[in-house]
Every structure is written in C-alpha cells, then in structure tokens.
Amino acid sequence: MTRPRLVTGARLRYDEVREEHQLLIPEGVVRLNASAAEVLELCDGERSLDDIVGALAARYEGADLRDDVLELVDAMTQRGLVVDAA
C-alpha cells in the first residue's frame, strides 16, 4: 500500500457522550482508541505510509511507531476499511 485512505462512505468522529473515537461506516460503528484514530486521520490518500509515520514521529519525539502504524493499516485494510488511493 502506498497512499492509504478510508474506504468511501467511512468517516471519523469523536462521540462526546461516550467519550470515544469512532469510525462510522455504512454497516455500523467501529470503536477506536485515540492512537488508532490519530493514524486513520492521516490516512487521507495524499500521504504515503512513510509520511504518516514521519508525521507521528514528529509529534511523539523519539517514539518508534512504524511497526504499530503498519499493523493498524494492515488490519484496517483486511477489514475493508482502508484502501490504497494510488
């Protein structure tokens, strides 16, 4: 995958009542932790995986996030929630 993006019809939101991040899809709602939501916000079809990792590394100085980002994007791809924009 070169430039991940959310599948058409999916959108991220924060539910203030439940105090949780959610990925809204036509089939329902996927609950997300804050880290997953932050990664998926960067999956806009414009950024490469390296760009996403770089943006997060800049926010969290010294953290090695590459494996975690790749694992999340892969899991979301397998579920059909993230696709390649390329």
Please identify what each model-predicted range represents.
Residues 1-41, 85:
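Acidic, low-complexity/disordered tracts enriched in E/D and polar residues
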Residues 28-86:
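Long, charge-rich, low-complexity alpha-helical segments
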